[in-house]
Amino acid sequence: PDHKGIEALNILLAEKPKPAQDLVGQTAPEFSLPDPTGKMISLSSFRGKYVLVDFWASWCGPCRLENPNVVKAYAQFKHRNFTILGVSLDQEDGKENWMKAVMKDKLTWTQVSDLKFWGSAVVPLYNIEGIPFNVLVDPNGKIVAKALRGENLATTLDKVLPK
């Protein structure tokens, strides 16, 4: 039997970047990605605020199921020096689906994507192995929490954000 496929897979897995140290406590890696109009938006432009960097995609069922929870948290905490930056891992031919999902799920905060799917520059920067995934960045650009979902999102925001 031909084991070239297995051999190739082993090589790919060996070359896959290993997650660096835990992101929490680190300075959030800087990135700039285009918004739907093509305007470049950088993470550092949110300095001075707490920002939830939310990695998702229109084709991701678990992301879409989590979106109402994120919308609720945004409504509850946006007045406490908090915002969200949505980073979509949609593909080039998926821009329309991305825009429809933003409208349908009522994601009213800033959205960006290079439409490069898993080839997006942010994937290795943040060691993203699956979505939905997020990091909470403090006003100085430091990651203070990650992978906040469900009740844990609101609970953590309530603890961390200024009253």
Go through each PLM region and give its residues.
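N-proximal helix/coil linker or "cap" segments that precede and/or mark the start of modular domains
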Residues: P1-P34, S44-K49, A75, E96, ...
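Short, internal strand/loop/helix patches
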Residues: P29, P34, M99-N140
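Generic structural signal for well-ordered beta-strand positions
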Residues: I41-S42, V144
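Short active-site neighborhood of thiol/selenol oxidoreductases, capturing the structured segment around
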Residues: S42-R64, V70
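Active-site acidic short loop of glycosyltransferases
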Residues: R47-K49, H79, L107, I128
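Structural microenvironment flanking redox-active thiols in thiol-disulfide oxidoreductases
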Residues: L65-D105, K116-P124
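Thiol-/selenol-based redox modules, centered on thioredoxin-like
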Residues: L136-K163
